[in-house]
């Protein structure tokens, strides 16, 4: 059996003051060596400050100075990815609402050209040959070469 040390008996919870009818107030405490005995009494008049909640402190808010930037290379790769990835097919083929109220001019395929710039007559969604993916069709590859 291990010896019980005196400093291990620290009462953390507040204790109800003993009534006057109890003859033996306090608690028996054994010492470091066998045979040592002491009487422990609580001072209820002394009020201690509560212990700080170290484990439950809220971390301070940090400001992140890093802002991701969408550079030209990332934009070109994203356009290539969108051009070659096909949209997922919906789980329903057609509803009555879709059949009656769908407008065909809103359904633009990714291969259709939307606009041109006056200085460069090439369509906006076409890319230079250096950045385009290899799986593109030969029509798109040869369509904008000068003759």
Swiss-Prot record:
InterPro entries: SPMIP3. PANTHER family: CHROMOSOME 1 OPEN READING FRAME 100, HYPOTHETICAL PROTEIN LOC689766. This is Protein SPMIP3. It comes from Homo sapiens. The lineage of its organism: Eukaryota, Metazoa, Chordata, Craniata, Vertebrata.
């Amino acid at each position: 059996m291990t010896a019980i040390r005196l400093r291990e008996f620290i009462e953390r919870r507040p204790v109800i003051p003993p009534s006057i009818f109890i003859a033996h107030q306090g608690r028996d405490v054994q010492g470091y060596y066998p045979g040592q005995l002491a009487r422990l009494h609580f001072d209820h008049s002394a009020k201690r400050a509560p212990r700080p909640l170290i484990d439950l402190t809220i971390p301070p808010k940090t400001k992140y100075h890093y802002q991701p930037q969408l550079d030209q290379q990332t934009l070109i790769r994203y356009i290539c990815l969108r051009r070659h990835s096909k949209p997922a097919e919906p789980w329903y083929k057609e509803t009555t609402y879709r059949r009656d109220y769908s407008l065909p001019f809103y359904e633009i395929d990714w291969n259709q050209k939307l606009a041109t710039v006056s200085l460069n007559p090439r369509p906006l969604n076409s890319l230079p040959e250096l950045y385009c993916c290899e799986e593109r069709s030969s029509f798109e590859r040869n369509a904008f070469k000068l003759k």
